[in-house]
Amino acid sequence: MTFSQAPTPSSENQTQLIQNAAELNTDPRQSKQMPLALKALMVKPTFFNVENPINPHMRKADGTLHALNFNKVQEQWTMLHDAYLKIGIPVLAIDGQPGKPDMVFCANQSLPIVDNSGNKLLLLSNMHNDIRHSEVPFIAESLISQQYKLAHLPARSSETLFEAMGDCLWLPGKRFLLGGYGHRTTKAIYNYVSQIAQAPVALFELVNPRFYHLDTCLSIINDDTAIAHESAFTEPGLKLLNKIFPNLIPVTLKEADSPGFACNAHCPDGKHVLIQQGNVQINSVLQKAGFTVVELPTDEFIKSGGSVFCMKLMYF
């Protein structure tokens, strides 16, 4: 495959990493405006399976891998696909690839960016797992057709790992990122991410292996509201989260851990919250706060450690 590439960031570009609440000197809502990413890419689950055990949710209590009901897999994927269409989010559905059983979790392979000049860039991941890293070119090829140019990190190594929108999340409508590290993404890589995205990055060390990505313990609802599970974060991380989000809503371990996976919810438009069904407590809180909760069954995908947010990539 031959791809057009974005220019490499220069050393003149500023890097701004925010590691604690004291370093957050301005309100993130005052950051430069950015468009909302209101298009979804999804990968068809043709080759989805639980066979590459890379997170704790893939195993049952006895240590064996979860078995999937493949009819339910297709039904649940289609329900999520159709739920996006129903709320006005167009979906680009691409084929999975044989030998890549986790490619359906397409939030992880790339970070879509609109730079200060309006150019659409796709920052490609250096994924922790070899099989998952082999998915990256297929996602890249799909978004090149959507007028994206590619941007690359330094060569993949144990020091340069980055799992994109599994760990790196935009504050909606703002040039401001939240970045998780510790399990799949390395802290140092955010110097490069900040440069190429032309955005400050608030950093969060993830300390609970059951919440291996930032998107498993934090769901950003809008620019002042988020839901989060506290045991995934350090105390400084929680203080920083509370400073960024005036309305930070806690999620219990029961609903955040599998099979609830509530913090892997997705609110694409500041109104509709797509979330695994049955999370009674957090769903009630969100409804009382004025959000429209769309409950969906994703339990077959949770057997592999992902739910709504993992199953799509939002792009501009």
Could you describe each region identified by the protein language model?
Residues 1-316:
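The feature marks the mature, well-folded catalytic cores of soluble enzymes
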